[in-house]
């Protein structure tokens, strides 16, 4: 799953894909590099990012999705997900040609999201996000480790199973649901690593998405220090390979070609 952020302030690629022409070119390059899905988002989830209105998100993502659908060539038929927590944005994106919704709130920020997914029959990624003070929602450098009574894997997996059940009760096809443990969202470095190691406990319920690409905890693990996003590729690839071995099957990434090659090699060795 290639990350196509049409935002000026995303942590790893902010501003790089702003504008329809730039975004479509990035999407085309990602597919040529081996991406199977495009994830297009109009609001950054980096620490401290400004809240973006529904109208502005729609203004950013809908023309890009429509242009991808109209461009043909390598983009013809490639599945597109829209990265949003707002049902109105998701509805507009689906009308423009999106096939799925990637919701970092897991359908909890907007009461209309579950109903929309059920009515439109589209795919959905449900992510776990610990509700902590806003400044800490996306941190992994806590002075005090976030509390997960019973252990982080048990709590996160239980929350995702319960939310998956709510989607299914509304009529969403279980085969269209992907589960995301929310690495880097309200977890310490140690807790992120535990979630990776115990992925099979969650993948027994449904396919698991790995969303660790270039996140700050990756640098703390691989480099032993705070680092910039551009320093985290090698660490990202290493942890992605481990996440594959642990059971993850969808990888949301900035660096498509590198991941395609690394994961293909790892998957062959696992066969």
Where are these regions (language model features)?
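Acidic helix/loop microenvironments that form the catalytic cleft of cell-wall polysaccharide enzymes
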Residues: 183
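Catalytic domains of carbohydrate-active enzymes, especially glycoside hydrolases
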Residues: 25-41, 246
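Short acidic/histidine-rich motifs immediately flanking catalytic phosphotransfer sites
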Residues: 31, 35-36, 75-78, 97-98
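Active-site-adjacent loop and "lid" segments of alpha/beta metabolic enzymes
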Residues: 10-26, 45-70, 78-79, 84-87, ...
